[in-house]
Amino acid sequence: MKSISKMLCLVDGEHYLPVTQESIDVLNNLEHIDIVAAVFIGGTEKLRDDSEESYSKVLGVPVQFAKNEDIPYDIIVEMINRYDVDTVMDLSDEPILDYPKRFKIACKTLAQGVSYQGPDFKFDPVTQYEIMEKPSIKIIGTGKRIGKTAVSGFVSRLIDKNGYEPCVIAMGRGGPQEPEIVHGEQLEITPEFLLEQSEKGVHAASDHWEDALMSRILTIGCRRCGGGMAGEVFLTNMKKGAKLANQVDSKFAIFEGSGAAIPPIKTNKNIVLIGANQPLNNIIDYFGPYRIGLGDLIILTMCEEPMCNEEKREYIEKFIKEINPKAKIISTVFRPKPLADISGKKVLFATTAPKSIEHELVDYLETNYNCEIVGTTPHLSNRPLLKKDIEKYMDEADIMLTELKAAAVDVATKDSIKAGLDVVYCDNIPVPINYKYPDLSKSVLEIVDEAIEDFNKD
């Protein structure tokens, strides 16, 4: 038997009141629905009486009117909380609501843990299991290839170095069928070891292997398939992974999202990553504002030309402040950090970074690590092109320096070892673009302390 769903209806003055009344009655006659209130969101064409009292009397439920001509987003949120609403039903239409306005309503309602639906659509809040028995944070993003795993590695190392004893639970599209523990603090994770794992059928460039290699801490690998508009996944074993995280010898848990998908585990605090390289409408429209609203700390990545100019970065920062004024914002770039000495070596560098910033990365490596970059490839996620680039440069290089992404193991590592090259893996470090931003390490540790405080309150 279905439980009763408390419903808030959005109505307008573009419909005759008797038509709206009939729709309310149809919904109220459904056994599992209880219409608790309505919000009048605008329109005057067919409105004969703008009295809340008379309108409420006809509809048979309390009706709250907008105080001006704008869509009353704040009133919708207020009514959701006042009446403990489960679902917002949209009985409006063009011209009162267009697509952007409806997405904005969806972001507002989902942020309250409430569904938003209309005649042919429905958006539900993302699943959040309340199962953690230790303090935890989520690291989520607004898309793929924005540096989530790199930031997760940075955060994990920082937390571990400061004595918080963390573990990482990561979900990926190539993750294991059953949650897999990798003891990064115990294993010697060499290129040969990862290649051996890959040949056994393990996705050895999966995020939890990268986390284990880069951070040298315990990681738990999970899988996921599909990603909804608001971040829900179709399939994942991360709930099992979270239960495993409760049992392992760690005191703090870091849940790492995948692409724009959100881990289905309720955590104490959230770090949200936004790729400044993304199309602007992916950030400010659709469900971008919803994800931004989840952040306690927001890290804007890839803030350099040609991916993002100063004008775009400042616009994004301003938008974030409007959506989530309480969150701290830090704009960053990524810079490579080899995990072994490459001084004096001739290096072939494989990365997922776009070719447009190749010069900056090459200059950084040669200046800071005393090496000579003899070739680069931005094709770690394109196996055929990656193979061609390796063949092109392998006779000039001593070392393959590669991020642990995509085809880094089954192509870059395998082909390089076969050609007699040493393989060194490379981390990416987030660096604030200037001194005006808060200290990144300090800001992360503040979020960790707040998460611990929040956990201890419960």
Curated annotation (Swiss-Prot):
It is found in: Cytoplasm. GO terms for cellular component: cytoplasm. Keywords: ATP-binding, Cytoplasm, Ligase, Nucleotide-binding. It catalyses: (2R)-2,3-bisphosphoglycerate + ATP + H(+) = cyclic (2R)-2,3-bisphosphoglycerate + ADP + phosphate. It comes from the Archaea. GO terms for biological process: gluconeogenesis. GO terms for molecular function: ATP binding; cyclic 2,3-diphosphoglycerate synthetase activity; ligase activity. Its EC number is 6.5.1.9. It is an enzyme of class 6 (ligase). InterPro entries: Cyc_diphosphoglycerate_synth. Catalyzes the formation of cyclic 2,3-diphosphoglycerate (cDPG) by formation of an intramolecular phosphoanhydride bond at the expense of ATP. Belongs to the cyclic 2,3-diphosphoglycerate synthetase family. This is Cyclic 2,3-diphosphoglycerate synthetase.
